């Protein structure tokens, strides 16, 4: 079954990412990985991770819950990723991010 990413929030301090996804119903996926699931990407979950672009990638899924707008807004409002703060800079000052390559182009 394919899952479509609607939105993703990264929490670098705890190495957890959250994605709002669609797969017959709207869900919130809580996971840990060094990959970024960007909005619009389509992936297939497996026992050890996900298949994305015909590659099986390691992802630890901690929880999948039905989408709740209030919970999603709380997650988005408490995100720690500086890429979405509106600061105009190419530097990331968060040195604890699990992602090796910033999906927002920060260095």
Swiss-Prot record:
Gene label: iraM
Listed InterPro entries: Anti-adapter_IraM, PmrD_sf
Functional summary from the UniProt entry: Inhibits RpoS proteolysis by regulating RssB activity, thereby increasing the stability of the sigma stress factor RpoS during magnesium starvation.
Keyword presence, Metal-binding: no
Family as reported in the entry's similarity comment: Belongs to the IraM/RssC family.
Localisation: Cytoplasm
UniProt entry keywords in alphabetical sequence: Cytoplasm, Stress response
HAMAP family in UniProt: Anti_adapt_IraM
Gene Ontology CC entries for this record: cytoplasm
Protein name, UniProt field: Anti-adapter protein IraM
Source species, domain of life: Bacteria
GO BP, one annotated term: cellular response to starvation
Principal localisation: cytoplasm
